[in-house]
């Protein structure tokens, strides 16, 4: 299992740390360089975490993709990315609903919404 994180803020950092400290089996985690300091720290801290060159590289190389960006950034970057039907996408983006995600990512992509409270 290859995991990818688009966005490297508090939510992504917490989830990545939790996964790396758990017994979940995975090959590697690719992360975006959205927040360069957090990305570098995660890459140094965990041996299976790598910084991707682009968001599309994350989509191309991972079968589970976590969307951890603000709604504004999500609306800017998601339409440019090419997902495949065998991927699973977990969205932490509070104000982009399931119908909007399906329209943007493609109807065959499996999408799970996981909204943190309070939404940020």
What role is predicted for each listed range?
Residues 1-53, 57:
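NAD(P)+-binding Rossmann beta1-loop-alpha1 motif at the extreme N-terminus of oxidoreductases
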Residues 38, 46, 55-60, 64-120:
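Rossmann-like NAD(P)(H) cofactor-binding subdomain of soluble oxidoreductases
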């Amino acid at each position: 299992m290859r995991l990818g994180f688009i966005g490297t803020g508090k939510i992504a950092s917490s989830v990545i740390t939790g996964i790396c400290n758990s017994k979940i089996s995975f090959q590697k985690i690719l992360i975006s360089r959205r927040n360069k300091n957090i990305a570098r720290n995660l890459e140094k801290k965990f041996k299976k975490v790598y910084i991707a060159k682009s968001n599309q590289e994350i989509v191309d190389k991972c079968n589970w993709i976590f969307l951890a960006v603000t709604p504004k950034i999500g609306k800017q970057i998601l339409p440019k990315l090419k997902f495949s039907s065998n991927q699973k996408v977990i969205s932490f983006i509070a104000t982009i609903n399931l119908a909007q995600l399906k329209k943007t990512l493609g109807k065959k992509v499996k999408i799970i919404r996981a909204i943190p409270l309070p939404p940020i």
